[in-house]
């Protein structure tokens, strides 16, 4: 069994919990997920099964994520979401939709982002959340992420803590909790993430996702990599690549990759083209 499953993660489960559930349900140990979702969050969590786990990196490196987020103002927590200890509360009822629109302009294109302390980002090989749990002080490393789009969908003028609902399209590694915290800092009110729903992860859409209790739809790898560079192998080339050997291909002599090598309708290998030679890095036996 090899392929991908588009799952809808419910709130309250970790991404690892979902992987463990799938392993047990499908009776296989080869299962991995693409892109961690916080336990409190819900939404699209793609899962790879069997040999498809070796293809995860190719989707993760290019997949943009889309979210619907609700952020509440006037509340600051230790985790930057509603799961953590409340550190401060204040009246933020003076905020308007216009105030929110002004600060959203800070979150377009490539930005530097500080991840939450309650996260799996590692410093000296140790996740930040462990430093926090053990009461150790550590400086979270700033990371560059890309925000393709951020839109105000709704302003909820609740008193004393108003809220907003946002649509966000962003790159891998973006923490929506960090965006919530930074918006609160810019407005000098404090803010925290109240709810998060991931509606898209690369080619995986919320509308097509499977509930955990349903029969899973297994998506063949070939369906997801149609837009990646590819070469078609002859029978002779296939036999050579299958055993890890390189083959000559017709190119302009450029070095590039990753390239997906097909024999018939099946992905046989991924690798690089160096000069006019395709050199396989990973070889697959889908369907065998």
From Swiss-Prot:
It is an enzyme of class 5 (isomerase). The keyword Ligase does not apply. Keywords: Isomerase, tRNA processing. Its EC number is 5.4.99.25. Transmembrane segments: none annotated. One of its GO terms (biological process) is mRNA pseudouridine synthesis. The keyword Isomerase applies. It catalyses: uridine(55) in tRNA = pseudouridine(55) in tRNA. One of its GO terms (molecular function) is RNA binding. InterPro entries: PsdUridine_synth_cat_dom_sf, PsdUridine_synth_N, tRNA_psdUridine_synth_TruB. The active site is at 38 (nucleophile). Belongs to the pseudouridine synthase TruB family. Type 1 subfamily. PANTHER family: PSEUDOURIDYLATE SYNTHASE TRUB1, TRNA-PSEUDOURIDINE SYNTHASE. Responsible for synthesis of pseudouridine from uracil-55 in the psi GC loop of transfer RNAs. This is tRNA pseudouridine synthase B. It comes from Carboxydothermus hydrogenoformans (strain ATCC BAA-161 / DSM 6008 / Z-2901). The lineage of its organism: Bacteria, Bacillati, Bacillota, Clostridia, Thermoanaerobacterales.
